Amino acid sequence: MSASPTKKRTLLASVDGIEVRFLGVQLNQSDLDVWMQIVHLSRQQLPGYNVTFSAHAMLTALGKGTGKSQHEWLKESMARLGGAFVEMTFHGRDSFGEKGFLRYYRDETTQRYVVELTESMLRLFEDGYTHIEFEQRQKLRKQPLALWLHGFLSSHAARYPLKITTIHRLSGSGAQTLRDFKYRLRKALEALVAIGAIDSFVIDEDSVKIKMIPKTSQLWKSGI
């Protein structure tokens, strides 16, 4: 397994007056799925209680196999989530830094996890994560830009046009030209329409307007 790229303290997003900077190993779309499934499980707990689950149950919920390699993959993902450092600046006035999205204990014999969620990070996802959203993401496998857009747009009503250059930068796309990226963007948005994640979109020369219902977050890059 190749190592995930390590990020220096870098501005990942600046939307609606909130700047998000990231330091550490780059999180990916699979990490987002693990995190949001844990957040979903937390909704079923009383406030303040830890989240518990078996590796087998988590992998099954994510639609993955349950063999040794998948268990190792989950360990890697949990370690990335536990090691991430995120700094949030609100309207240029207040900044808050947080080490890790979560803390966890794992029983190596039973492969059962006990997870303590970081309160400030959990608040960023306070709108929750529905089963419908999870099913939508399952349909977007092998479509990294569509997956990233699904996570990004879930936290934005996007009633105003978004600059295509901004989406290009925030998504981490490897498209070398704006023309190439606009083509990829159109295909990704068409995929979101097809699964019912957004109602519609309009792309003009340098911006795109999207009609949808907001939900989750934009902290994960697409890696494309």
Model-derived segments and spans:
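Charged, alpha-helix-forming regions
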Residues: 1-224
